[in-house]
Design a protein with these regions (language model features):
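N-terminal type II signal-anchor transmembrane helix
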Residues: 2-38
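Short low-complexity stretches enriched in small and charged residues
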Residues: 7-11, 38-43, 79, 117-121, ...
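N-terminal start-of-chain detector that recognizes signal peptides
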Residues: 11-15, 59-60, 83-85, 137-140, ...
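Pocket-edge positions in alpha/beta enzyme catalytic cores
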Residues: 15, 41-44, 89, 287, ...
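Hydrophobic core
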Residues: 18-19, 52, 213
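Signal peptide-directed extracytoplasmic domains
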Residues: 24-191
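Bacterial extracytoplasmic/cell-wall-associated proteins, especially those involved in peptidoglycan
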Residues: 125, 131-132, 146-338
Length: 338
């Protein structure tokens, strides 16, 4: 009788093994939602494996977090998942995702954004580096809805795209890159002025607008707070800022013309709310994306009585500062070429 039961036991065991193999194959297979093309998954620094597995499941990269956890235990890779941005190809199995996150293979592109660049210049560089189309980047950076989502008190994200060096995969979603730059802005702002939230949205925007103008005017770090003080003093007295940088912004970013070699009297008469020669107020928005020096100067301007400045040493980037118009006119005659 015992010998007669062996075929049935063997068949039962085989059935269990086949079922287990089928279940494992199913749990390892890619979810159907991955048919949308390459997507990006972020492993945060110090994130636990259970958190990673849970998010992979929530975001539709894997079918079962338990299967990933079991695979990691069997392979002894629980502590080997590396932080970073990962491009997950469509159709990736759970084990393929596991191997990708353990390998740390990200193929990142270095993107360095200089201080004082505008949205359009950044967009062109993003496309040049093969990261995202310029049109997509501009659309995201000028999206009022995205600005609201990121708690930016402005119609666009001009001024809030922090100039820094970023490492991202290529290609990379433009909206995600823009969001990353804005998040970096607020991280850096916290170091510049921890109490910035007390300003409210309008107060913060004014500071960023001022910083963007300072960014386009200063050349020496030590002069940035002095230049900021000139603009603050003029605003307090109700005098127009008379910044050539705002005119250049109108010409290049609004009129889409080449950057002028110099600003003419005709240019200073352009009818635009960004014209600080025509209107005694800040422009309606930032004219560039300021860096740490300009932001610090806008939040902490020097205490001076200066109302004017003129470039006195183009090679060194030094300016001469004056307290009244008479002294300023004398400085212009002395330092500016006729």
């Amino acid at each position: 009788m015992g010998h007669r039961r062996w075929p049935r036991v063997a068949a039962a065991v085989a059935g269990v093994l086949v079922t287990a193999a089928a279940a494992a194959a199913f749990l390892n297979s890619a979810p159907h939602v991955q048919d949308r093309g390459d997507r990006f998954f972020v492993v945060e620094k110090g994130e636990s494996l259970s958190s990673i597995a849970g998010r992979l499941d929530d975001e539709g990269y894997i079918r079962s977090p338990a299967f990933l956890l079991a695979a990691a235990r069997l392979r002894r890779t629980e502590g080997s998942f590396k932080a970073g941005w990962y491009r997950v190809p469509p159709g990736s199995t759970t084990l393929a995702v596991h191997d990708l996150l353990v390998s740390g293979s990200q193929s990142l592109v270095k993107l360095t954004i200089p201080e004082g660049w505008t949205i359009s210049r950044v967009a062109a560089l993003v496309e040049e580096r093969g990261i995202a189309p310029a049109a997509d980047f501009e659309a995201a950076a000028r999206s009022r809805a995205l600005a609201a989502d990121l708690a930016v008190p402005a119609a666009t994200l001009e001024g809030f795209l922090y100039p820094d060096t970023y490492f991202v995969p290529a290609p990379f979603p433009a909206e995600t890159l823009v969001s990353m730059m804005v998040e970096t802005f607020f991280e850096r702002l916290e170091k510049v002025e921890p109490g910035w939230r007390r300003l409210g949205g309008g107060g913060l925007l004014e500071k960023v607008i001022l910083a963007s103008i300072v960014e386009r005017e200063y050349q020496l770090t030590e002069e940035a707070p002095l230049i900021a003080s000139v603009f603050v003093n003029r605003m307090r007295l109700g005098i127009g800022l008379e910044s050539c940088a705002t005119i250049a912004y109108i010409i290049t970013e609004i009129q889409h013309l080449p950057h002028p070699e110099y600003i003419t009297l005709e240019d200073k008469g352009i009818d635009s709310p960004y014209n600080t020669y025509k209107w005694a107020a800040l422009p309606p928005g930032p004219i560039a994306n300021p860096g740490r020096v300009a932001l610090d100067a806008a939040f902490h301007p020097a205490r001076t009585d200066y109302l004017y400045f003129v470039l006195r040493d183009p090679d060194a980037g030094k300016h001469y500062f004056s307290k009244d118009l008479d002294a300023h006119n004398k400085a212009k005659k002395l330092y500016l070429k006729k």
